[in-house]
């Protein structure tokens, strides 16, 4: 892929996100989306810089200060990158809950923490999932 977008989740995971991104091919244009302002424990753009992500990816605030990624609340710059990235890696259950209805291909990486989500999708509570969503369908990997 020439363009990859990683949607960050928890502040504490940003260090591990950097380690993951360091293994992407160097020719790849990598964008790391973070919150524009503090929300619960989600990583902000400033915290992403503190974690060193700016050394391996272009950090882009998503333009919203709400849980998950609600595209109608995000900045036009974020939307442009979201729509043109060849690969989108979405971390965290909140991002899954707000993006799983989108029609584009998205890879979701998260731990199932909510009994309602577990029951509705028939996941086990506490399961770690890597899901590929393409053309409106989810597939477990």
Features from the language model and the residues they span:
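Conserved nucleotide-cofactor-binding alpha/beta core module
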Residues: 1-3, 14, 21-64
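Structural motif
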Residues: 3-5, 86-87
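Well-ordered, non-transmembrane segments within structured domains
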Residues: 4-5, 14-15, 19, 110-111, ...
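Short, contiguous strand/loop micro-motifs
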Residues: 7-8, 65
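Short beta-strand/turn micro-motifs composed of small residues
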Residues: 8, 34, 110
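Gly/Ser/Thr-rich loops at beta-strand to alpha-helix junctions
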Residues: 9-18, 37-39, 93-97
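Active-site glycine-rich loop that binds ribose-phosphate moieties when present
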Residues: 12-19, 23, 70-74
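C-terminal functional extensions of proteins
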Residues: 40, 47-141
